[in-house]
C-alpha cells in the first residue's frame, strides 16, 4: 500500500485576473456552482438545460436548434466543429494571424483534411481580400475557418465580411469566438455564421471548462450527410444533442454532464441577459478607452492598430530594458494582479491585459494602471 499523502485544503488568495483568461468570476457564479449537485437526468436539471440553451442562443444571437455547451473548454469546442463537419480529403481555407489560427490548421490536418493557409502578420486582422483570393483559387474548398478575436495578439477580424465571402463562394464558415463572445459585437444569424465555438472563462466570467457551440441548419445538414463516421465519440454532436434535446419528452444519456459547472454557466449567461448583450459590448469598449488613455500616458504602445483592436484583450509592447517576468511576478506578489505574458511570436515582447466580463470594471482599470506605474518607475 502507498502511504496516504497529507495536505492542507487548498485555499488560494483572491487574485485580480487581468490576463487573457480565465477572467474574474462573478460572485453569483461561484455561489451558483456551490449549490447542491443533482443527477444529470434530474427533471429540474433538464429544465435548467433548456433555459441554458436559450441563454446561449441569446449570447450568440442565434435561433440555431443545435446550440449547447460542450463539457470541456474552448479547445474542445474547436475540435467539436472540425471533427463533426470536416471529412478526410476536404479542403479548408484557414486564416492564420496568431496562435489560434494555427491551432485551426492543426485540427484540419488531424481530421485528414487539406488546409489552405491565408497568413496575415501577427497583430493584424484577417485580410478579406486575401481570403477572397484564396477562395477564388480553390473553388473546391468546403469551409472557411478564422478566429474572430485572436487572443494571442488582441486583433479583431471582420467576421461579418468574412462570412459573407464564405457564402458567396459556397463555403461553410467555422468561427472561433472564444474571446469575442460577450465582449464585442457578435451576431451569428445576421452574419451567417455556420459553426461557432467559445469558452466559459473569458468575457462570460464563468468558471473554466465549458464551451458554448452552435451549428446553423446548413452545418447540421453537412453533419447528417457525412460519408464517414465522426472520429470522436465524445464530441459527436449527433449523439450529444440527443441529451441536450428532448425527443418525445425523453433525453438520451450520453455522458455525465458537469452539473455544477453548468449551474455556473447558466448563472453567468443569466447575468449577461440581465445586463443586455449590447450593454455588455459597450461596457467593454468604455473600459478599454479608460485603460488605453492610462497606458498611453505611461508611454506604453499597443501591438494592434486602433481600428482592429480588441477592447477586452489589450496587447502592449514591453518597454526596452524591462524584465517581463520580473514585472509580472511583482504585480502578482505586491498587488495580487495577474496580467498575461506574450504568446508565440510575441513571447517576451508584449504583455496582454484583459478586460473581460466581470473584470471590465473601473476599479480594475485603476488598479492596473497604478500598479504598472509604480512597478515600471
Label each region the model flagged.
Residues 86-102:
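Conserved PLP-anchoring active-site segment centered on the Schiff-base-forming lysine
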Residues 24-25, 201-293, 297:
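Active-site C-terminal subdomain of aminotransferase-like
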Residues 301-334:
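Conserved PLP-binding catalytic core of the aspartate aminotransferase-like
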Residues 10, 345, 349-377:
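PLP-dependent enzyme catalytic core of the Aspartate aminotransferase-like
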Residues 125-182, 195, 203:
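Active-site phosphate-binding strand-loop segment of PLP-dependent enzymes
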Residues 189-201:
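Conserved active-site segment immediately N-terminal to the catalytic lysine
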Residues 1-43:
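N-terminal "arm"/small-domain region of PLP-dependent enzymes with the aminotransferase-like
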Residues 32-80, 99, 103-109:
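Conserved N-terminal alpha-helix of the aminotransferase class I/II PLP-enzyme fold
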